[in-house]
Curated annotation (Swiss-Prot):
<dbReference type="Pfam" id="PF01809">
    <property type="entry name" value="YidD"/>
</dbReference>
<comment type="similarity">
    <text>Belongs to the UPF0161 family.</text>
</comment>
<protein>
    <recommendedName>
        <fullName>Putative membrane protein insertion efficiency factor</fullName>
    </recommendedName>
</protein>
<dbReference type="InterPro" id="IPR002696">
    <property type="entry name" value="Membr_insert_effic_factor_YidD"/>
</dbReference>
<keyword id="KW-1003">Cell membrane</keyword>
<keyword id="KW-0472">Membrane</keyword>
<comment type="function">
    <text>Could be involved in insertion of integral membrane proteins into the membrane.</text>
</comment>
<dbReference type="GO" id="GO:0005886">
    <property type="term" value="C:plasma membrane"/>
</dbReference>
Amino acid sequence: MLRIVPRNIFILFIIAYRKIISPMYGPVCKYYPSCSEYCQNSIANNGVFLGAAYTFMRLVRCNPWSKGGVDMPRVSTKYRVNKFGFASRKNV
């Protein structure tokens, strides 16, 4: 339970960014999923620190010289993303 709370707090900020700031720029990301969606899924599946590290590596790859394409985040076996985009523990 305590591991899910920090994830969902960060995910709440990402959702706010995607709803408020991201529409001002339009769809400019050359990767699928977009960098903010990648960050949201990465933090939900892997935790705040590891998810932030994966997101940082993704942002470094997102530059004018990259080709883009499909780049899915790594998926955890312990957590899942619910229909609202927040992390919850998988029922084993």
